């Protein structure tokens, strides 16, 4: 590209961004297009910064070449990020949601060797971690009539000695290290699947951002579950000997102890073992799995008097089958408080990858799809698909390794279409996560379905940003229409991405600011004049 063409391309990118922001300050334009009011707040300067970065890239017109730092450097980088953020956030805000319950279970296990929390609640042990009040979360009673916690005992068991040694901050440090290790495992899976160092690095960066970044310093089962799942899958796909196959079985068998919703994922890993392991490693895998399953059943029988893995809930909970799968899918993707894409837009590339031959022809695609569907299936029919009062995308954290590996298959191909946005999407999600965590006292990471989303309020201008994102906790037809608008925009981008692979003029649309600005304008118009009318 000649210097004059570079200059025109750079100026065009700046013009699109500056033009949109400039229109927002014209009263007549805002009256006609109310959504422009969102640019009269912090998002206006954000758009200008993005436009400036795109203009600089068009002016320089140099391909971005990033080498593979290797697993140890990636682990150290991830650990420093998670530890620094976790220490800052944990020091500035007490626990909430399910966190005090997991910590109280850990305290009871270490100090008293049991999970009878009646005395812990009587002493208000939760005051060590939160001002409360904290109401008990009890499931089905034990066979002797005593109450038993509704939460799975796996995470409290793992955290009990850590909590005894250093309290909540030590637990945060342990989860931060687990998150860093998870991202390295994802990097290895991506290298195996895509075979390109740049693709592996992108997969690591996607995994290290939200939502894993959120749960790397919250006391929930999501990061340990994702790590156990990803590590077990990586071992099974690596042609292991009997010893490593047994370790894969141990990791897969740990999933039900962390949360009962992970039982289908554990079963799927067993199917992957059957597909990939020869006789001796397969025997070692199932020897461990059988022993762990027997232990799980014995635990249920000893406590509840039944062998059912769902004994904690007294059988299959009504909430597990009363949800709407369609609303859950839309919510998991687009919900303004609990969705994935508003906080981690890089996973748009994973959705695009699923529609391409590159992923379906990649190594182990069937095994990865099997495990991914097993993770997703219990969530789709769960009434509380959003996970309660918690950071965004809670129940999708165990799916992040598979989403990251999927987008890496696309990153291994020539950079065209949506892949031109890969690093801006990574940067946008990570910057938003850091903004949300920087001021713990403002509670921007803690969401509930019955109130506005704090982070979008903080980023609003004259018009609320939250107006243009759906809230799908309740089955509101208006919110469903807003979600449909975003679903249509997503499908359009994926279609254009497929066309960009073969057609240079379409690919050129992804190189500047025109396509994203026009798409956001279209979404705003549809929300204002159709979805919310």
Describe each model-derived feature in a short phrase:
Residues 1-90, 191, 280-288, 424, ...:
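Start-transfer (signal-anchor) and selected internal transmembrane alpha helices
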Residues 111-165, 313-321, 383, 452:
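Interfacial juxtamembrane loops and adjacent helix segments
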Residues 237-238, 264-290, 294, 349-363, ...:
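Perimembrane helix-loop-helix junctions
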